[in-house]
């Protein structure tokens, strides 16, 4: 089967990019590809044949129909207007046309210098490409909207960061790479007609049902806000901290995008800061809902030339509604509740307080809670708490709440185990795979990818364990 590519972005938004070709790496070679995703997309196996070199995965060749461009956008970084940004090391190669008429961006990260590289070198390093591949696939299998990873290429090209590292490329796929920052770019250049063209493009291709509706722009922004609210709710319930929620890293489609200094909670710490460059804690875990709203407000400002203020405010209210509704639903599922009762939040907050005091592992606590039996006061979770009396008091109230519903243990446990993962991508697991890969051993990278495909399956090995001492509080930066 021949892959078919289109160039809608290039054809319809000529002011938003620079056309250019990738710059290949020295002795590039494919070290991992997503076989499951490749099969779903009917990508010929021959394209992954190492005897053909790095091929499209290393920017050495293009597939028929590809028209590569680097996109320009701007944004607020750490709450401050940063001006023009853009694809400083990534190139949108083309948009794969799928059988249902939708498209999928093929975006090559680490593809070389672009007009938007600023002081950078246009390269990505092996460490960061591995982290993004693992994170995006982990999020996908957790059921959270995200970009996807298709391939990783390593090379003999040295790249200087804090130390000398190995140049690499990641093929990232997404329904769209349209960002809040695209709209900000033209708004601050005083080109509102181009802001509206971006909105028209989004509606035409992603919300075509509203093309002929008078209030199409208001409806569209309301849906952007709602998708963002649901996404942030998913992050909070699974314990994911993005680390760098700048407006240029926010997806119009409500996807998790641009994995840099991210982290999943180990110990439950609502003030967890994943990015060691975030000295003020702007992007700490418990501040993500507020930051997302602030980012939506910046996007709303760009839309004022063609959406009324009242409609924009209604959409921002929709964000809050979507966030709280989805978060509440997800947390009730995590606790095994099938109905909503007035004291549920009290019970949840009491558990969070206990976990924070004791430094309980976020993922393991909820997974172990999934094995609760209503009539039994014994629980393996009890042994993880030092203050047993406090846990016992909470656990009694929790089991009493479970008994208010006529749901048997087996059904409830089944629901809980579908939403409380046994496996998340802990930073130490990613680092172990990176350390091995940098020594030329890709086995752990492949093994970890396989493990992350089954996050809701219990395991008795170290993939499901708390981090070892060396793996606690690993510092992660924006350097990639």
Swiss-Prot record:
InterPro entries: adnlytase_SelO (IPR054838), SelO (IPR003846)
Disulfide bonds: none
Reactions this protein catalyses: L-seryl-[protein] + ATP = 3-O-(5'-adenylyl)-L-seryl-[protein] + diphosphate; L-threonyl-[protein] + ATP = 3-O-(5'-adenylyl)-L-threonyl-[protein] + diphosphate; L-tyrosyl-[protein] + ATP = O-(5'-adenylyl)-L-tyrosyl-[protein] + diphosphate; L-histidyl-[protein] + UTP = N(tele)-(5'-uridylyl)-L-histidyl-[protein] + diphosphate
Cofactor field: Mg(2+); Mn(2+)
A single GO molecular function term of this UniProt record: AMPylase activity
Coiled-coil ranges per UniProt: none
Entries under PANTHER family matching the protein: PROTEIN ADENYLYLTRANSFERASE SELO, MITOCHONDRIAL
Family per record: Belongs to the SELO family.
Protein name: Protein nucleotidyltransferase YdiU
Organism name: Salmonella paratyphi A (strain AKU_12601)
